[in-house]
A protein has these predicted regions:
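N-terminal regions immediately upstream of nucleotidyltransferase
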Residues: 6-7, 42
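Short hydrophobic/aromatic beta-strand micro-patches
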Residues: 6, 64-66, 105
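Flexible, gly/pro- and Lys/Arg-enriched active-site loops
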Residues: 13, 45-49, 53-59, 69, ...
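Acidic donor-diphosphate engagement hotspot in glycosyltransferases and nucleotidyltransferases
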Residues: 17
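Extreme N-terminal starter segment of soluble prokaryotic enzymes
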Residues: 1-5
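Short, surface-exposed acidic-centric catalytic microdomains
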Residues: 20-70
């Protein structure tokens, strides 16, 4: 199955964290035939009243590839990698060594307690959409709402002018 992931880091050696996460995806044979976008640096999203020291820039990228795992198995393995690379159970939007989100899983739509595919907030995040446009511009968004059926390229052009 073809998948797309979003990876981000804003704590520690951000570039190394992204590299190690991709290496773990490959070494653990979770994802094959990987194509990775360029790296994008962006400001952290913060909740109102968040501590000032949480305001650390992220580096993000998108990765597409193929997996033999079902979505829940993939999510479990991704959480294992995040823990292996130092991520703790943390407060929402706090700094993290690594954050890996499943954006897309072939043509599946998933809505469970632990997982929503396509990722529910992806369209509102330029740091997800711009890297994704590099690696799968012609993928047609199959989520709900106005942009269902639009390609990633069309969505990025309309929402972000890029």
């Amino acid at each position: 199955m073809k998948i797309a992931l979003s990876l981000g880091s804003n704590k520690g050696d951000r570039n190394k964290n992204l590299f190690l996460a991709i290496r773990e995806l490959l070494d653990r044979k979770l994802v094959s035939n990987i194509v990775c976008s360029t790296l994008f640096e962006n400001k952290a999203l913060l909740l109102p009243g968040a501590p000032v020291d949480w305001d650390m820039d992220y580096i993000n990228c998108a990765v597409v590839g193929e997996t033999h795992l079902n979505p829940e198995e993939l999510l479990k393995n991704i959480k294992d990698i995040e823990g292996f690379l130092g991520r703790k159970s943390i407060v929402k939007w706090s700094p993290r060594e690594i954050d890996i989100d499943i954006l897309y899983y072939d043509t599946l739509q998933v809505q469970s307690e632990s997982l929503v595919i396509p990722h529910v907030e992806m369209l509102e995040r330029n740091f997800v959409m711009l890297p994704l446009k590099e690696v799968m511009p012609q993928w047609k968004y199959n989520g709900k709402g106005k942009y269902c059926g639009y390609t990633i390229e069309e969505i990025v052009r309309e929402k972000y002018g890029a």
